[in-house]
Amino acid sequence: MPPVTTALIAANVAIYLLQMAQPSLAVPFALWPLGASAASNGQVSFQVWQLLTYGFLHGGLVHLLFNMFALYMFGGALEQVVGSRRFTAYYLVSVLAAAVTQLLVMALAREIYPTVGASGGVFGLLLAYGIYFPHNRVYFLLVPFPIKARVFVFIYAAIELFLGVTGTQEGVAHFAHLGGLVGGGLMLAYWRRGRLLRR
C-alpha cells in the first residue's frame, strides 16, 4: 500500500484509540459551528484548525471501519496514479471543502453540534477513483453485483443528495460528504487546466 494512504489509515486508527481512552481530548478538534453561540452553551466554539482535525476523528468503530476500508480501497490506487504529494493535497482539499460545506449547513440550520469523520475526504477519493478508473467494478451495499466505478459515484452522490434534502437519515453530514466530492472535483479541474495550459 502506498505511503500516504498507509499513514492516513494508521493516523486515523491511532487517534480513534486515543478518543476511546480519553474522549474529552477530541472535543476541541471536532468541527464546531461558527460564532460564539456554541461557547455560550458551555461547549467548544469554532477554531480554524478544526477545518482539518475533524477529519481524523470518528463517532464510533463502524464509522471508522467504513471510512478506513474506503480509504484503503480507493486511496491506494489513486496515490499510485497521481503520486503521494498530489494525493495528500487532494485528500486534504476534500476534507477542507467538506468542512466549509458543513459550516454553511450548520449556520443556515442554526444548529449546534460537532462534526467528525474522514467521510469528506473519502468522497473526494471516490470521485477521483470514478474518473481515473471509470470501468473498474466495485460493490455497492444495495446492489448484489459489482457495478462500474463511474456509475457507483453517480448513484452514491444521488443518494447522499436525497438524504440530505429530505433529512430522512439524521446524524449524518450528507452535505459535507457532497462538499468533499465537489471540492475534489474542483481540484481535479484545476489539475486538468494546468495540464492544458502547459501544452
Show the residue positions of the predicted features.
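A detector for small-residue-rich transmembrane helices and their helix-helix packing motifs
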Residues: 1-199
